[in-house]
Amino acid sequence: MREMTPARRLAYALLKPIVNFLFNLIWSTCRIVRIDGEEHVEQISATHKPFIPCYWHQHHFFCTWYMRQLIKRGLKIGFLISPSVDGEIPARLAQKWGGVVIRGSTTRTGAQAMRDMYNVVVKQGISPVSTSDGPTGPIHVFKIGDILLSQLTQAPLLPLAYAANRAWYLKSWDRFIIPKPFARIAITIGAPLTVPKGLMAEDLEPYRLQMQNSLRELTEKAASLVHPAP
């Protein structure tokens, strides 16, 4: 693992404002044509309890913008970021935007990591953002971890997606989307889902599929809002 040397620390300190400027440049030039389903956010916010925002890894760019709007409303949004030096710039950006940085651990087992996230949600009252098919895919396949976390904490899962009428698609496993300047953006938010306690492992699959289908439908709906049928 690479170490955080003084030279690398200086480089990251210099890069942070540049990256932040580029994010804000694109965010500020894009036009939000619709945010569909905000009543679900209002419903969750009224409980004053943590929740788990979920979206596809490729949607991270503009869903992060929406998370910033929730932070401005006073919601305690957390971002799970790699503990390696590669996570240093994302961590600094998340802090600048007012988010809570949750640094993972490369030495944690699955059970230990789940216990850590339980503490983040239940004891600290943080709503941890999840890219539910990440960090390595397969693309648009909802991972079981979010289902387990909702069951354990009783925090509702909140699915959301976005689409841009003009965008760059990176040649990565997730085809990461970066909207082009002045693109039209639609954000879609689905109904929250809390996974009941007391279910056996084999009973969780329907909930995983429900969230997977919800995100896929929200993705299609967002696309239809920025690419209306002729």
Task: Give residue spans per PLM region.
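Non-catalytic C-terminal accessory region of glycerolipid acyltransferases
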Residues: M1-N20, L25-C30, E42, K96, ...
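Short N-terminal amphipathic alpha-helix/helix-capping patch enriched in small hydrophobics
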Residues: I18, G37, W56-H59
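A short, well-structured juxtamembrane/interface segment
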Residues: N24-P50, F62-C63
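General small-molecule cofactor/ligand-binding pocket signal
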Residues: V33, I102, T188
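Residues at the C-termini of beta-strands that transition into short coil/loop
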Residues: D36, P83, S105, A161, ...
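Secondary-structure boundary motif
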Residues: A46, Q69-K72, K123
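Pre-Walker A (Motif I) flank of P-loop NTPase domains
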Residues: T47-C54, G125-P128
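Catalytic core of membrane glycerolipid acyltransferases/transacylases, capturing the structured
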Residues: F51-R108
